[in-house]
């Protein structure tokens, strides 16, 4: 009886059908898929456990902990797999057989997956078939919140044009709108589109941060220490649409504080010109100039002298004179920054802390500048020209940046009044 094959059990047969069904999905064999569904051999919403190391199919609640091996695979229906693999024909077959379009076996609907992988064709099909545009994932994100790459901009536009809510906040501890998300990821085109379609420019997340504050903070790529032009464009767009430049987060930081923390003179200039208050203090009692001072030494791509110049020309309070050695500690390799700050005082005397703050190699490298610094900052008064500059600046106060360029003076004198560094102090 060795040649007789044992009959396949019902469970074994179901297992084989499930395997064939999954194989048809993976190979885009929509003909075979259709035949299986017509014969009703398997439920159209059958859930599979598939490899998903990048968690494209999965979404979890914030704060939940799972062992790493659990995160290497996810549960998914045929719809999710068809979207993930870009198999439009299989997607259509499943929808024609009444697959549940908003199913979330592992926290995401097929529409969430389509937006995350930026598959515009699948987004259109799912929307045409009735997918919920504002449905939350298990992590509390809508489909618009999953549009985080330049390639997904068209997906976001499609959703908005079909009625997705551009002001819907995430249902989690962040409470961010799609505008916050686009600002974070530097999608300037999408930010402009959201604003044109009714996004509230001053919407606040759970930390009371506006999209302007988010874009300002993320304008510095911390790993590369480079500034993002896209984030600068976003800030320009938001300010042009009347974003509140002095909005404060839950630490009382304004966007100017965040720009100062990044030592980003482009954004600092943009915000000061838009009416940012240079002397606003945060919860730590720090104004923007203190943040520039704190980070100057760890921002290699920055031009701190411009940051100080901008703030002082917009009326920022000067560094407390007994603490001036901290300016030298932070800027010892950038004499121009020291020059700008020291020229904001009528007179300031050096002390031993100044000398200790300068490494010997920097002292030697910038000897002419440091020699002039110690020579000028002694017991004798500064030049009459410098004192005249201080008198004019004191009279103009926070209008220096506007008033001085309008004076009938030669350009070199205007630059002198605006603290333009010259490389030496006299």
Swiss-Prot record:
Molecular functions (GO terms): enzyme binding; ubiquitin protein ligase activity; ubiquitin protein ligase binding; ubiquitin-protein transferase activity
Disruption phenotype: Asb4-deletion mice develop normally without detectable gross abnormalities compared to their wild-type littermates. With age, male mutant mice display elevated body weight and fat mass. In contrast, female mice did not exhibit altered body weight, lean mass, or fat mass with age. Asb4-null mice display a full spectrum of preeclampsia-like phenotypes during pregnancy including hypertension, proteinuria, and decreased litter size. Placentas show signs of early differentiation defects and impaired vascularization.
Tissues in which the protein is found: Highest expression detected in testis, with some expression detected in ovary and heart. Not detected in lung, kidney, liver, spleen and bone marrow. Expressed in the developing placental vasculature.
(3S)-3-hydroxyasparagine PTM sites in chain numbering: 246
Transmembrane among keywords: no
SUPFAM superfamilies noted in UniProt: Ankyrin repeat, SOCS box-like
Pathway(s) where this gene product acts: Protein modification; protein ubiquitination
Impact upon substituting residue 245 to T: Impairs interaction with HIF1AN
Domain of life from the UniProt record: Eukaryota
Transmembrane stretches, start-end: none
Subcellular location: Cytoplasm
InterPro entries, per the entry: Ankyrin_rpt, Ankyrin_rpt-contain_sf, SOCS_box, SOCS_box-like_dom_sf
Domain remarks: The SOCS box domain mediates the interaction with the Elongin BC complex, an adapter module in different E3 ubiquitin-protein ligase complexes.
Name of the protein in question: Ankyrin repeat and SOCS box protein 4
Lineage: Eukaryota, Metazoa, Chordata, Craniata, Vertebrata
């Amino acid at each position: 009886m060795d040649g007789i094959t044992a009959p396949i059990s019902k469970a074994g047969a179901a297992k084989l059908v499930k395997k064939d069904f999954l194989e048809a999905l993976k190979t885009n064999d929509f003909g075979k898929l259709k035949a299986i569904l017509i014969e009703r051999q398997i439920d159209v919403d059958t859930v599979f456990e598939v490899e998903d190391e990048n968690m494209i199919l999965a979404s979890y609640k914030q704060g939940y902990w799972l062992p790493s091996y659990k995160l290497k695979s996810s549960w998914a229906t045929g719809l999710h797999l068809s979207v993930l693999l870009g198999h439009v024909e299989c997607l259509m077959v499943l929808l024609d057989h009444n697959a549940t379009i908003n199913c979330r076996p592992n926290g995401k609907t097929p529409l969430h997956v389509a937006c995350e992988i930026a598959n515009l064709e699948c987004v259109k099909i799912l929307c045409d078939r009735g997918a919920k545009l504002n449905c939350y994932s298990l992590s509390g994100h809508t489909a618009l919140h999953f549009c985080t790459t330049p390639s997904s901009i068209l997906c976001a536009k499609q959703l908005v044009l079909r009625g997705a809510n551009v002001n819907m906040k995430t249902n989690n501890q962040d409470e961010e709108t799609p505008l916050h998300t686009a600002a974070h990821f530097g999608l300037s085109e999408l930010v402009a589109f959201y604003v044109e379609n009714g996004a509230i420019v001053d919407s606040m997340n759970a930390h009371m941060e506006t999209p302007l504050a988010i874009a300002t903070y993320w304008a510095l790529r911390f790993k590369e220490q480079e500034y993002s032009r896209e984030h600068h464009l976003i800030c320009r767009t938001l300010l042009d649409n009347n974003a509140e430049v002095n909005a404060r987060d839950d630490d009382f930081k304004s966007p100017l504080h965040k720009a100062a923390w990044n030592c980003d003179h482009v954004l600092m200039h943009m915000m000061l010109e838009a009416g940012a208050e240079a002397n606003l203090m945060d919860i730590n009692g720090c104004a923007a100039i203190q943040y520039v001072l704190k980070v100057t030494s760890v921002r290699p791509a920055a031009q701190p002298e411009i940051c100080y110049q901008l703030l002082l020309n917009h009326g920022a309070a000067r560094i407390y004179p007994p603490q001036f050695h901290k300016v030298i500690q932070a800027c010892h390799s950038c004499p121009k920054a020291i020059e700008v700050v020291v020229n904001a005082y009528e007179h300031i005397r050096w002390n031993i802390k100044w000398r200790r703050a300068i490494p010997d190699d920097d002292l030697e490298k910038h000897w002419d500048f440091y020699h002039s610094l110690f020579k000028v900052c002694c017991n004798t008064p500064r030049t009459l020209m410098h004192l005249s500059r201080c008198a004019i600046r004191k009279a103009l106060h926070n209008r220096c940046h506007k008033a001085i360029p309008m004076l009938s003076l030669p350009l070199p004198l205007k630059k002198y009044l605006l603290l333009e560094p010259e490389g030496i102090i006299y």
